[in-house]
Amino acid sequence: MANLAKATGKLKSVDYEVFGRVQGVCFRMYTEDEARKLGVVGWVKNTRQGTVTGQVQGPEDKVNSMKAWLSRVGSPSSRIDRIDFNDEKEITKLQYNGFSTRY
C-alpha cells in the first residue's frame, strides 16, 4: 500500500500569521471549514496581538491552495492586510488528524 506522500505528492508543512481585520469576523471558523474542504490538517488561533496564526500540513498542492485562500479570501467580513508564511518544509508524515481551532 502506497503511503500518502507517494499517492499525492510531497507532504508540506507551513506556519502562517494573518494581519488585518481578522478577529471578530469568524476568520477561524471559515479557515477551519476551508481546510476541511481542501483536506489539509493543522490548526488556527487568535493571538493577543490581534492576528490569526496557525499551521497547515498536507499534500503540497492542497497546502498551496490553502495558502492562496488565507492570503486572498478569508471570511466574508475580514480584511487581509498581510500574511507571513514561515518554516515551510517537506515532511514525511502528518502531525495532526484533522484541522482544529485552538484557544
UniProtKB/Swiss-Prot annotation:
Enzyme Commission numbers on file: 3.6.1.7
Keywords assigned by UniProt, alphabetized: Hydrolase
* UniProt GO MF annotations: acylphosphatase activity
Entry's family note: Belongs to the acylphosphatase family.
Identify the PROSITE patterns for this entry.
ACYLPHOSPHATASE_1 (PS00150), ACYLPHOSPHATASE_2 (PS00151), ACYLPHOSPHATASE_3 (PS51160)
Enzyme class, top EC level, equals: hydrolase
Do you know which Pfam families this protein is assigned to? Acylphosphatase (PF00708)
Protein name (database record): Acylphosphatase-2
- Per its UniProt entry, which superkingdom is the organism in? Eukaryota
Active-site positions on this chain: R28, N46
Record domain Acylphosphatase-like: where? 13-103
List the catalytic activities from the record: an acyl phosphate + H2O = a carboxylate + phosphate + H(+)
For this protein's source organism, the top of the classification is:
Eukaryota, Metazoa, Chordata, Craniata, Vertebrata
